[in-house]
């Protein structure tokens, strides 16, 4: 568990990172650096989006799988790294 904490601290220390969260397979936040309401909102919506993206990738090619999802808007850049049991979500300010 210490390795996970170290990794999250390292990610959080990068310039521009607003917050990180780890979400379980059901979309429930396990670890977060954001406030509760923001965490619940992002976790629920990004979990749904990631599951839909994963399903779409599999529909296109059943041998393939989603490994990373990056969403960039004017305000934020959201990166999602899905695993079998968890999602790692990082929210940062987009680089200019």
Swiss-Prot record:
The gene is DYNLRB2. Keywords: Acetylation, Cytoplasm, Cytoskeleton, Dynein, Microtubule, Motor protein, Transport. It comes from Bos taurus. The modification N-acetylalanine is found at residue 2. InterPro entries: DYNLRB1/2, Roadblock/LAMTOR2_dom. Its main location: cytoplasm. GO terms for cellular component: centrosome; cytoplasm; cytoplasmic dynein complex; microtubule. Signal peptide: none annotated. The keyword Transport applies. Acts as one of several non-catalytic accessory components of the cytoplasmic dynein 1 complex that are thought to be involved in linking dynein to cargos and to adapter proteins that regulate dynein function. Cytoplasmic dynein 1 acts as a motor for the intracellular retrograde motility of vesicles and organelles along microtubules. Homodimer. The cytoplasmic dynein 1 complex consists of two catalytic heavy chains (HCs) and a number of non-catalytic subunits presented by intermediate chains (ICs), light intermediate chains (LICs) and light chains (LCs); the composition seems to vary in respect to the IC, LIC and LC composition. The heavy chain homodimer serves as a scaffold for the probable homodimeric assembly of the respective non-catalytic subunits. The ICs and LICs bind directly to the HC dimer and the LCs assemble on the IC dimer. Interacts with DYNC1I1 and DYNC1I2. Self-associates. Interacts with DYNLRB1. Pfam families: Robl_LC7. This is Dynein light chain roadblock-type 2. Belongs to the GAMAD family. It comes from the Eukaryota.
């Amino acid at each position: 568990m210490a390795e996970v904490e170290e990794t999250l601290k390292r990610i959080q220390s990068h310039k521009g990172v607003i917050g990180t969260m780890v979400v379980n397979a059901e979309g429930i936040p396990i670890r977060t650096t954001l406030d509760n309401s923001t965490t619940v909102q992002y976790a629920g919506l990004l979990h749904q989006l990631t599951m839909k993206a994963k399903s779409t990738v599999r529909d296109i090619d059943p041998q393939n799988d989603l490994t990373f999802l990056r969403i960039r808007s004017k305000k934020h850049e959201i990166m999602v790294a899905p695993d079998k049991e968890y999602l790692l979500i990082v929210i940062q300010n987009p680089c200019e």
